Amino acid sequence: MSKSLWSPSQDAISRSSVYKLMQTLKINDYQSLHTWSINNLEQFWSIAWDQSHILGEKGERSYIPADFMPEAKFFPDATLNVCENLLSNKYKDEIAITSILENGDKLKISWDELRKNVFTCANAMLNEGVKPGDRVVAWAPNNSQTVIYTLAALSIGAVTSTASPDFAPAAVLDRFTQIKPVLLLSSPSYQYNGKTIDCLKSLNEIVNGLPTLKKVILMDISLDKYENWDSWIDPFQDMSFEYKKFSFDHPGFILFSSGTTGKPKCIVHRAAGVLLKLRAEQLFSFDIDESDKVFFFTTCGWMMWNWLIFILGSSASIVLYDGSPTYPNLHRLLEIAEDENCTRLGLSAKYIDLLRKSEANYTDKFQFNNLKTIMSTGSVLSPDGFRFVYQNIKSDIQLASISGGTDICGCFIAAVPILPIFSGEIQGACLGMAMDVLDNDGNSLPADIKGELVCLKAFPSMPLGFWGDERNSNFKQSY
């Protein structure tokens, strides 16, 4: 076996949530713990609920298997509000969200400000007649308003979906026409690569293609046809708001496939399933807690955006950045992580490779005193990419190559805080995820043979189905 690039300290191991779980269960190593977790799904996900401090009525049953794996049920008797679970912590004046634009403009929002804004926005949505199950969409930048809007939709049981402003009108309409939204949030412009890009012409085209819209809300400015964000929410600033609870299978998100073989598939996710899956990842794969500040470079068109905002459920602070990752310089994302004293940084493998090809050494330029983890995803991180991070960015860091997808709004395989890092390797499968690599005939393959990465058992963030696929026929054909 090759020499490890990094190993956790004994102190870090003993403080980790996954080690504490091993101690509780009297299990000595991660592989045995993982095997236990996939052989005892009901008990594992019940523990994950408890240790994540999920607010709500858990109910008696944790798991009901099914012949067709995606039809298995988790917590069928549970009721909860996902937004409440993301915002209900003890913090008030501490910063919850830092939102940064490409030109350097920065907005910091405290936990109390975030709650107030979400409740105000939720009341504005209720005033528009938005009901549980209605679709509420955004074609918008990655900023605090988009997060507030999304959380408000979740708080009232609406189904939310987002698209990045770099999506052309045709791409947006291919997605949103299928789900018939009632509200749309957008921005008159966005910044990218040193330019301000006007969105109004494209917005008009999108709105004209969505006849079900009751209201279009525009960030920053007012136009005759569209209401300004501030004027929309201001009448509801002082209104009270009370969370309503929904079933575990209540839909919360619609994410979209790439659309390479036709119109993008509208993948419907149960909000509570995503909450539990991501809280389990945050707890056992990454050890994220209230001491963390997490920056993951993403747009609103990628599932990692949903992944990032659910970090709020760990009482951690998040950093949003809207703009080019390489403007005004190649190391812009590293600058943000340094300036914001981030503890966790999420990058694409492609971006790390761009840094590597520049042959720059960043160890003198950046100290990264608080940075504990760099996460890499989007594609395979090469062994050269691993070595570059340790030699040219920071040597004492957990480099977590992770893999998941839009289909599950989470990770299949990710970090393991108690194990060493080896070049070109992902540390292990997430707890509760029964992963294997199969050939075309469904046979399990040895570790050194390429095949299809497959999850063999049910987990909470499996999709509910495809929107509009009433008999689940297309869904069953796809999975």
Regions found by a protein language model. Name each.
Residues 93-95, 218, 233-256, 263, ...:
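Conserved pre-ATP/AMP-binding loop-to-beta segment of ANL
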Residues 103, 183-248, 358-359:
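ANL superfamily adenylate-forming
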Residues 1-109, 113-123, 207-212, 220-225, ...:
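N-lobe entry segment of adenylate-forming
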Residues 31-36, 83, 97-151, 168-173, ...:
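Conserved AMP-binding/adenylate-forming core of the ANL superfamily
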Residues 308, 314-316, 342-346, 356-421:
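Gly/Ser/Thr-rich phosphate-binding loop
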Residues 430, 443-479:
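Conserved ATP/PPi-binding loop(s) of AMP-dependent carboxylate-activating enzymes
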Residues 159, 275-293, 303-344, 358:
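Conserved AMP-binding/adenylation subdomain of ANL enzymes
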Residues 180-184, 201-216, 292-294, 319, ...:
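Conserved helix-loop-beta element of the AMP-binding
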